[in-house]
Structure formats: structure tokens, C-alpha cells
Amino acid sequence: MGKLTLGHRGEASEPDFFRGVLGELVLTFLFVFIGVGAAMTDGATTKGSTAGGDLTAVALGQALVVAVIATAGFHISGGHVNPAVTLSLAVGGHVTLFRSSLYIAAQMLASSAACFLLRWLTGGLATPVHALAEGVGPLQGVVAEAVFTFSLLFVIYATILDPRKLLPGAGPLLTGLLVGANSVAGAALSGASMNPARSFGPAVASGVWTHHWVYWVGPLAGGPLAVLVYECCFMAAAPTHDLLPQQDP
């Protein structure tokens, strides 16, 4: 397992450093603009969380935008667009803490800008915020978000970072499919944000902060936990077993 790395002197002058931070800014802006825009267009929100209406359409929109944006940005910055993903990869030693802090700052700025632009373009229409479903308490919301984000990072590791991945290049698509499935599963719980930046922008633009902390604590706990579990229990440098028994000719 990789170690947490603060970063090194001169890292900011590396050619890919600024490109990566700028990439996260642009990619997160597009991700939030499209994702929140899809929720606003559908209008299927109850207390700000996706519930009722055409939930499938919203979930499909989330799945597609994650798959496409992650694929487009993978060679630029890794296509994180999510502070929980960035922190988790820092825990796994895949990105320095210095770089990850700037990635997260870019993600928050981009999410806010995207939501303010959406409000302006729609004539002041409220940006739907993530909110706990009726009967779901804050602690339950934290656990739900932790589980959903755990599944997200587990799939990222299994389909992108593990050298034994079954379908090279398909990781972003599979990750998007999981996000769509979680969006459906989480509609009656917390809305399945899995992404503090995705929750932050709408909250800033609308001024609604009720239980907003849930969408930080849950994802930032579940993501790194998934990294620790996968790195310790499932990661291997090379194949250790045959998927099918070998037959003698």
C-alpha cells in the first residue's frame, strides 16, 4: 500500500501539475453543470433530493456524465471531480497531499460556479440540494453516504487501479454505471451524493445548508475506508490465480 505523501519542493513547477489542477476545475464544472442541470430539468425533487418523478432519467444522467467526464479527464488529472475520490487516492499514495488539496479547492470552486451559472441561466430557479429523505436521521445519512462512497472507491480500485482488472479501459464506464445504480438506491435515504463537491455547489447557490455536513462526513469516511480494505485485502501486483483451470493438450 502506498504512503501518504506531502509533496516535494518544486512539484508545482512540474508540467502536469498546473494542467491537472486546471483539468479538475474544468471537468468538475462540466460534471456539476450537467448533473445538476439534469436534476433541475427533470424537476423530480422532494426536499431537494431526487425522489419520485422520473428518477430513472436522473440516475441515467448521473451515470452518463460520470462515465464520460471520467474518461475524458483520466489522462489529464485522473478525472476525480470528487473530493472523496481525491482524498481516498491520497490515502492510497496515488496523489500527494499538496496536489490533492489544490484539486479539492478547484472542485469546490468549479461546483459553485456551475450552480451559480445554472441559477442565472434559469432565471433564478433553485438548484436542488441533497437532503435526507423523510424518516432518515443524520447518523443514518452518514452511514448511507459512507456505504455508497465505499462502493464507489471499491469499484474504482477494482476496475481502474488494480493491475488484474478484467476490462482495461472500461473502468470509467463501470464507475458511471455504479453511480447511476447508487442514485436509484439512495433516493429513499440520502440521495446518494458520494461527492462533497456535488453537494457543495447547490448548497452555496441556494443558501440551504440543512444537514450539509452529512455529505462531507459520510463520503470522506467511506472512500478512504474502501481504499484501506482493497489495498490490504484484495490488491495484488500480478495475477495470483487462474480464472479457469488449465487443460493439458
From Swiss-Prot:
Alphabetical list of SUPFAM superfamilies matching this protein: Aquaporin-like
GO biological process, one term: water transport
Sequence motif: NPA 2, positions: 195-197
Molecular function GO labels: water channel activity
Signal sequence bounds: none
Motif NPA 1: chain residues: 82-84
Domain of life: Eukaryota
Role, per record: Aquaporins facilitate the transport of water and small neutral solutes across cell membranes.
Domain notes: Aquaporins contain two tandem repeats each containing three membrane-spanning domains and a pore-forming loop with the signature motif Asn-Pro-Ala (NPA).
Protein name per Swiss-Prot or TrEMBL: Aquaporin TIP4-3
Biological source species: Zea mays (Maize)
